[in-house]
Amino acid sequence: LELGGAPALEAWVRATMDGRLGSAFPDDGAAWWAWYMASTRVDTEVGFIRGLLGADIGPDLARIACPTLVITTQGSGLSTVEETRAWQQRIPQSRLEVLPGDSYHAAVTDAAECVRLTLAFLHEGT
């Protein structure tokens, strides 16, 4: 990405869009999301990816002190439901919600359902 600049970033974004947004997301929505992601500064995106590659938050999960809602999809390309559940169970006061689909950006692809689940979760704690 660094050597190719913005055109390489846009090509990478488009090539990886299916896993990010899943197979059911509308083409025009995916095109907009690709444009939006590709408008990020290349050095910002590269720095973000480098930070993710070396990140291991596993040891910190038990230190999360607030109620936590974890949302994933059945076919997320990032981790299986079982792997996500194993992480979620290490977070005190947490709950896992699994949505149908195969995206790993559920907040984008299933925004209305994520909002509904989040509001219900927040109201449970009040």
Regions found by a protein language model. Name each.
Residues 16, 49-52, 87, 114, ...:
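Hydrophobic "lid"/C-terminal helical patch
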Residues 93-126:
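Catalytic active-site module of serine/aspartate enzymes centered on a nucleophile-bearing elbow/loop
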Residues 57, 66, 80-89:
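Short alpha-helix in the alpha/beta-hydrolase fold that links the catalytic acid
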Residues 40, 79-82, 109:
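Residue-level signal for the nucleotide or nucleotide-sugar donor/cofactor binding architecture
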Residues 64, 70-72:
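Short beta-strand/loop motif that positions the catalytic acidic residue
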Residues 75-79, 104:
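Acidic catalytic loop of the alpha/beta-hydrolase fold
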Residues 5-63:
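Conserved alpha/beta-hydrolase catalytic His-Asp/Glu region
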Residues 64-65, 126:
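Residue-level preference for short coil/turn positions at secondary-structure junctions
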